[in-house]
């Protein structure tokens, strides 16, 4: 299980950060062992800088048969984008969810909604 929070401003920092995390996921985890990488990547799904992650791992949102494509960033009600991801390798994504329907007693508990994955391995 790996987690990261990539830079939110610099394009080069995003690209290099994603490449580093992808590379380290391959180096740290032996072949055949399930890997799950979660995090605020601070990039929209069509950002080319996610390419290195998608080469090393699968995007759970894209491969899960049951998938939630709602936004994960709410900007405290002022913005709505997909910035949070779960990537996996050597496991099968079953269901990807954005947890934004619960009532926590406040309109927003964070500027991001949690994401969840049901997987088998």
Predicted regions and their residues:
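Active-site-proximal beta-strand elements of phosphoester/diester hydrolases
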Residues: 1-6
């Amino acid at each position: 299980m790996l987690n990261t929070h990539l830079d939110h401003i610099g394009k080069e920092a995003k690209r290099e950060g994603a490449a580093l995390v992808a590379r380290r996921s391959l180096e740290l985890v032996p072949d055949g062992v399930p890997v799950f990488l979660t995090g605020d990547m601070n990039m929209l799904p069509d950002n080319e800088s996610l390419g290195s992650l998608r080469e090393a791992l699968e995007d759970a949102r894209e491969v899960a048969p049951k998938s939630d494509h709602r936004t994960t960033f709410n900007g405290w009600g002022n913005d709505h984008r997909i910035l949070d991801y779960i990537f996996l390798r050597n496991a099968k994504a079953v269901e990807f969810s954005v947890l934004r329907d619960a009532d926590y007693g406040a309109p927003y508990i964070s500027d991001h909604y949690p994401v969840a994955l049901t997987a088998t391995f």
